[in-house]
Amino acid sequence: MNNTTVTEDLLRTASRFWLMKSEPGECSIDDALAAPGRRVSWFGIRNYQARNFMRDDMTIGDAVLFYHSSCAKPGIAGIARSASDVYPDELQFDPESEYYDPKSTKENPRWLTLDVEALFKCPVVEIGRLREEPELAGMRVLQKGNRLSITPVEKEEFAFIVRNLL
């Protein structure tokens, strides 16, 4: 399947659309594409609003703009889809992990993750390029002060990006 077919299929079938940020040093689009089944766990979410988006709103098959953040060229680096229901992020229980949470228990985990399946890589659409498009002015990633690692994207915004910028 070519990239256009993949994105048009997502536009037809996805219930919701998301932008998910990952630091390339932690997990890049290349890492995700090289993973078994092109699936990676979206670990390390430690913001309640982002966690709640995953827990309450994301479903298997939702479309994802895979966004590289905290790097030289932040921007959309690929397209993915959510590939599992949420489950406890095991790193919250590991005292050696930077994601350890001493208040979290196996019986009552605070932090969740889900699997994301990478579909394809694209030339990075940098944040400055996104800002140039009036059709994208409402995207949360473009709002001043937004630091959430997972944000909803309107279907029309997703469609504009995949049809005009990728």
Residue ranges with predicted function:
Residues 21, 117, 151:
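Residues in well-ordered beta-strands of folded domains
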Residues 78-148:
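Aromatic- and Lys/Arg-enriched surface recognition patch
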Residues 67-74:
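Short, charged beta-turn/beta-strand-edge "cap" motif at the junction between a beta-strand
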Residues 8-12, 56-58, 72, 105-108, ...:
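A general structural signal for short secondary-structure junctions and capping/turn motifs
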Residues 14-17, 60-63, 77, 111, ...:
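Short, surface-exposed beta-edge/turn micro-motifs
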Residues 1-60, 157-158, 165-166:
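Compositionally biased, charged N-terminal/linker segments
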Residues 65-66, 81:
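Hydrophobic beta-strand signal
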